[in-house]
Amino acid sequence: MASETAFQATGAGRIVISVDAMGGDRGPAAVVAGLAESASAIPGAYFIVHGDEVHLGPMIAKRKDLKGRCEIRHAPRVVTMNDKPSQVMRHGEGTSMWSCIESVRAGEATVAVSCGNTGALMAVSMIRLRKLPGVNRPAIACMWPSRNPGGFNVMLDVGADIKADAEDLAQYALMGASYARNGLSLERPRVGLLNVGTEEHKGRAELKVAQDLISANAAAGAYEFVGFIEGGDIPGRRCDVIVTDGFTGNVALKTGEGTAKLISDFLREAFGANILSKMAAILALGSLKRLQKRIDPRRVNGGVFLGLNGTVVKSHGSADGTGVAAAIALAARLAQSGFHERLAARLASAGRAGQDAPDEMAAPGRSEKR
């Protein structure tokens, strides 16, 4: 193990983030670039960086912003995107991903960030961190750009498990509402259950049971249940938290990302078609840049694993430095708000409304009561 400095996971204004530097498609260079950007933006953040010391050492040494802020944990092996979760569970020790999660389990870091294989990361997280008491299926929650004043909605599950029964969906509502309180600064989030229609008679039988459970838990969970919602409500104003199973959520997420890219490509083609359209593009440059920023997937990079004894943020495997920095910023925000402890308290006893609300809201958003 090589380190520039040693530091504690706790302290006034200090947070320690464990980062898997080797699992992404772009390699450690993108992760180190994201670390450097994060170090400038988050003065109180320190990083335990896991991966091949031979590669990481020179990269980190070149970044002045990382001086005294990083400790390298040598991990010679890498979990690839093709590795099966079952294989990683049996033989993953010694990989950068395993080492990254182990730092959270040991209490050296508050939160973990990885760009690696999603299935393997969930498997390693479950066997090393274990599930919170009472949790049947952990979920992955993501931020979805929306028309709400805060700019985002929360959706879960987006791929942790393709199955979810009525009780799982009810638990997702509790976890999603807690995430919205701490990640979006919403005092009383509105929760919607994704269905093929908003009418009471539509949908599978388990969705109707889930609807009753989520509604019954609303007061204890300190959220407002708006009932069934449709796909068109995902980026809309009707709710703040979208609850669904992992299969449906993952398909919706990938469809949304693909649609955003398609729109971006169409705009680029349209404004480059001829001299007049190019002139129009110049005149509309400011507006186009603002639109590009709003639909840029890198800006909302980072899915959060909910329901574990520790916080894990999953970055896109293809994330560049900007995307990695966004995932680290999310991890830092959740660590600063004490999100994990508040979520555990909510799941352990949902009887006291507001017990998982942060003392100071950590991100801009709405805080008015509904």
Curated annotation (Swiss-Prot):
GO cellular component: cytoplasm
Pfam families: FA_synthesis
InterPro entries, per the entry: FA_synthesis (IPR003664), Phospholipid_synth_PlsX-like (IPR012281)
Pathway where this protein functions: Lipid metabolism; phospholipid metabolism
Function: Catalyzes the reversible formation of acyl-phosphate (acyl-PO(4)) from acyl-[acyl-carrier-protein] (acyl-ACP). This enzyme utilizes acyl-ACP as fatty acyl donor, but not acyl-CoA.
Subunit and partners: Homodimer. Probably interacts with PlsY.
Record protein name field: Phosphate acyltransferase
Species: Cereibacter sphaeroides (strain ATCC 17029 / ATH 2.4.9)
